[in-house]
């Protein structure tokens, strides 16, 4: 974060989000560093508040640990916190998902993002057709979860402000971000509108540059794997002159 501060005038930034991640990776020292180096918004992601489901999907934290991390962030002064949950997780039920949504609402974050399970092609779940026939992964059951989330969140002043879909999503359903008024994630809106340049750093990063006059979008992709990123770094930097030229004209 110090490197970012040296490279960018963060005093001009309207929103500075840090993906704090899962409860088992968050520490007080990390949150203090995030707070003291200019971040204005963080995301803490339980995915579910059901310990049995967390275990089933290989997560190493518990709902209680998430609650502790959330409370810690509040005590440290964070006043714009997003939480993520996923509808359709293996072994989850409508009642379990309902409990997750209700508990998140009670914790009173500024925004809640409701994702629908997307099964990656490399995942074991994708390879097993039988898994998709289990009751908890039927289109109807997941639709019921998503509909409940909409009703409960809007009833508690969380308004939907952005939506997107991914491939292999259960029921071809969507991911929806809900936020309290004035707490919408600007990055999410601008990205969906294809209205924001992205400067990506590190392995698997994707830079996107938008020409304001022509609307042309140019993308540059970093190598995915760290060993490849390191060994082919010079070749990858071949687009740097074009990037610098673009930025100098902004």
What are these regions (language model features)?
Residues 1-148:
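Conserved non-cysteine loop/helix-boundary elements of the Radical SAM core domain that shape
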Residues 177-250:
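Radical SAM enzyme core and accessory elements
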Residues 1, 69, 96, 169-174, ...:
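Short amphipathic alpha-helical surface micro-motifs
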Residues 117, 166, 204:
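Histidine- and/or cysteine-centered catalytic micro-motif in compact active-site loops
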Residues 122-201:
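A C-terminal junction/extension of Radical SAM enzymes
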Residues 90, 97, 101, 170, ...:
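Alpha-helix termini
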């Amino acid at each position: 974060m110090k490197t970012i501060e040296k490279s960018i005038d963060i005093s001009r930034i309207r929103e500075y989000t840090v993906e704090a991640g899962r409860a088992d990776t968050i520490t007080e020292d990390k949150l203090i560093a995030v707070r003291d180096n200019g971040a204005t918004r963080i995301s803490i992601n339980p995915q579910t508040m059901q310990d049995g489901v967390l275990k089933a999907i290989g997560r190493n934290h518990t709902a209680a640990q998430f609650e502790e991390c959330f409370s810690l962030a509040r005590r440290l002064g964070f006043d714009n916190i997003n939480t993520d949950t996923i509808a359709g997780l293996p072994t989850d039920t409508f009642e379990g998902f309902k409990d997750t949504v209700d508990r998140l609402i009670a914790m009173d974050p500024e925004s809640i993002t409701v994702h629908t399970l997307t099964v990656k092609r490399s995942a074991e779940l994708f390879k097993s057709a039988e898994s998709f026939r289990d009751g908890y992964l039927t289109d109807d059951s997941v639709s019921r979860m998503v509909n409940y989330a909409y009703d409960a969140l809007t009833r508690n002043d969380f308004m939907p402000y952005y939506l997107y879909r991914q491939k292999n999503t259960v029921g071809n359903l969507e991911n929806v971000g809900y936020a309290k008024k004035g707490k919408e994630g600007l990055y999410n809106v601008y990205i969906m509108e294809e209205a924001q340049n992205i400067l990506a750093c590190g392995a698997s990063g994707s830079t996107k540059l938008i020409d304001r006059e022509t609307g042309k979008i140019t993308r540059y992709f970093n190598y995915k794997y760290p060993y490849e990123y390191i060994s082919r770094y010079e070749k990858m930097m071949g687009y740097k002159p074009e990037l610098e030229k673009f930025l100098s004209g902004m």
